[in-house]
A protein has these predicted regions:
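Glycine-rich, proline-tolerant flexible connector loops at the mouths of alpha/beta enzymes
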Residues: 1-23, 142-143, 201-205
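Alpha-helix-loop-beta-strand connector modules within alpha/beta enzyme cores
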Residues: 12-41, 97-100, 104, 158-166, ...
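Catalytic alpha/beta core domains of metabolic enzymes, predominantly
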Residues: 64-198
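Alpha-helix N-cap and loop-to-helix initiation/capping positions
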Residues: 14-22, 85-95, 150-154, 207-214
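Active-site beta->alpha loop and helix N-cap motifs at the rims of alpha/beta catalytic domains
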Residues: 16-91
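Short beta-strand segments at enzyme active-site cores
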Residues: 1-10, 39-43, 113-114, 236
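Structured C-terminal cap/extension of enzyme domains
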Residues: 122, 157-162, 184-244
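Short secondary-structure transition/capping segments
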Residues: 12-17, 51-52, 77-78, 125-127, ...
Length: 244
């Protein structure tokens, strides 16, 4: 389960929290409710100060933590030509990536390399070849951000061809009607599947999802239609080279 920590005060739940005590409270609740679950922590933060996410990694010790593997101008334009939000740089220079990787190595977290564009996929291979990272490569193709890779299934063979040897991979599909053909093709090509309200509000039939659970039920259906079955937590740990 991929987790973003949020402030717990009334009316503040839309705001992120990097307080370790909050992170531990959330993590404990999830682990108690779902024994054996693989905990995947978000780490995305703008700017050079990564002390908040780092403190949460050290406190929670997630099995997986997001490793944003390159920078991106994070942009979106509305239909009337106005910016959806002020243009921003999601800055992830090599020095920042290296600092996160060091902490993940120290705490035993598997880095999930978040790749927003083709060049970032290629960068992960360079991290391995340069020795910046020496563990199992697990890549997440983030597709559908307007200033990144489009949520186009035709891109998948190209991206798969750029994977480091032995890598596992998955797709985060962002958008509306375009995300489900992408999930379907990911399942057919052997990739891992993920979804949630962070990435889409809509089910394959166009209805608005009422919960993450409805989205998960839909994506499980796609996996089975492609002749695949969902892994148990133990099977997923083995596949991702995580401790049992």
């Amino acid at each position: 389960v991929h987790v973003h920590y949020r402030q717990q005060a009334a009316g503040k739940g839309h705001l992120p929290s990097w307080e370790p005590t909050v992170a531990v409270e959330i993590a404990q609740a999830i682990r108690e409710a779902c024994p054996g679950i693989i905990f995947n922590q978000s780490t995305g933060i703008v700017g050079p100060d990564i002390s908040g996410p780092v403190a949460c990694i050290r406190a929670v010790k997630p099995e997986i933590a997001a490793a944003n593997a390159g920078s991106l101008n994070y942009l979106k334009v509305r239909s009337d030509g106005r910016w959806a939000w002020p243009p921003m740089l999601f800055d992830n220079p090599v020095e920042k990536v290296a600092a996160f990787l060091q902490v993940m190595q120290e705490t035993g977290a598997l880095p999930e390399f978040e790749c927003f564009d083709v060049g970032i996929v290629r960068s992960v291979d360079m991290f391995l070849r340069s020795g910046l990272y020496r563990g199992h490569p697990d890549l997440n193709f983030v597709m559908g951000v307007e200033s990144g890779m489009p949520a186009d299934p035709a891109l998948l063979p190209i991206l798969i061809g750029l994977l480091p040897a032995g890598a596992t991979w998955q797709v985060t599909a962002i958008g509306r009607e375009n995300v489900w053909p992408l999930h379907r093709r990911t399942a057919e090509l052997g990739g891992n599947l993920r979804t949630g309200l962070e990435d889409t509000f809509y089910l394959p039939d166009g209805r608005k999802a009422r919960s993450n659970g409805e989205l998960i039920d839909a994506i499980v259906g796609l996996a089975r239609a492609a002749g695949r079955e969902c892994a148990t937590p133990a099977e997923a740990r083995k596949m991702l080279h995580l401790a049992a």
